[in-house]
Amino acid sequence: MGNEKYQQGKTKNCLQYYILPQKEFGEKMAAIVVKRGANHIFWKDKYGENIAFSAGTAHFIEHKLFQQEWGDAFTAFSQNGASANAFTDGDKTVYYFTCRDKFVENLHLLLDFVQNPYFTEKDTEQEKSIIQSEISMYADDPAWTVYGQMLEMMYENHPVCNAVAGTAETVEKVTAEALQKAYEAYYTTEHMVLICTGDVPVKQIRMAAEKVQRHQSDMRVYFPMEKKEILEKYREKEMGLSCPCFQIGFKFQPVPKEKWLQTRIAMGFLLEILAGESSSFFQMAYERNLLDEPLGMAFFCGEGYAFAAFSGIGEQPEETAELLAQELKYLQKNGLPQEDFSRIRKKMLGRFLRRMDSPVSLCMGQIEWAMMEKTAADVLYCIKTLPMAAAEKLLQNAFCKDTMILSVVK
């Protein structure tokens, strides 16, 4: 990762930071991670009273923070030769920039606008139509539709079943006052992380981080109780596609935070063995003309939820799902092949090491690892040392046909 040793720590005002110098690169990147996202809509105040923000509130704040009283932060970054952006998902909101020059100036700009919201009723009302247009665009996308439909079939109460941007109706309910209240709950310093990669000035970064003021809140997030069972096994929606797209999902029990890293890596091994390009499942699916290419595979876990998803395009989604279930049953009966496990370990190590090859990919990786309070070294060690028994245990205990879902868009 470069000649200078990485640094991690916490400022006197509780801002966590990871500085990952890469002296061989001209490109630099910085990100502020707020460990609050679309799933964090249910809160209790200091008196124990329940407060619920509208679905899509975290995403709305992300849009609005770039609009400052002094002007547009995007424009300011551009004038400094930087490219800035942001994104929100269920668990976090991330603001970042990349540049080659004026890194410190851009870092100060990033830290400044994230700490200083400027919400007015006029600007909030104007933003609603922009976000509602974005929601409408996603609603017309079959891939987003089939994924969202899968989550609705899995979860009844947990906000993970909501679209990150909310709906046109929930966005309409947002007010400047509600945004300010949500900002004060979400953007506490102890839930924020600064990450810097590339040929960056470590001392100046630490000085800038120490100047970040402490923000605290007496509000506490909570998640409604969610039953173990799924709500539906099969649902399809008609969108006039020439070939159906589908998501095969498995709902799991929530994973304790201290086990997130090992579970994610163990699940990575499992998904590759079960349905990767070299798997028996894909070879059979290809020979039977069920699939032309391997399924997309992903595992997600966070506060109060965990699930795996397999995405694909094919004329016979139900037959594909049944074949996957049969392969899963076979592996549960016969165990994971040692050869496959060793091969995938090498593949995952290669993929991980390639991530070190650019400031952007390393920063994006550390964004995910910071959510688990881990570093690249922790991830590398886990990939190298994960015992096959850990993946076997997941195989036997997590996957169950009773919590298997098929979401289809035709």
What are these regions, as identified by a protein language model?
Residues 69-182, 292, 322-329, 336-376, ...:
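Acidic/histidine-enriched segments that form metal/cofactor-coordinating
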Residues 99-104, 198-203, 313-318:
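Helix N-cap motif at beta-to-alpha junctions
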Residues 1-73, 180-284, 403-410:
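His/Glu-rich zincin catalytic helix
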Residues 47, 64, 94-98, 118, ...:
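Second-shell loop/turn segments in exported
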Residues 247-254, 273-314:
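A structural supersecondary motif
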Residues 219-224, 293-298, 334-343:
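Flexible, glycine/charged-enriched surface loops at secondary-structure junctions
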Residues 107-110, 194, 205-210, 320-328, ...:
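PAPS/PAP-binding and catalytic site of the sulfotransferase fold
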Residues 24, 86-90, 161-163, 184-190, ...:
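Short, flexible turn/loop "capping" segments at secondary-structure junctions
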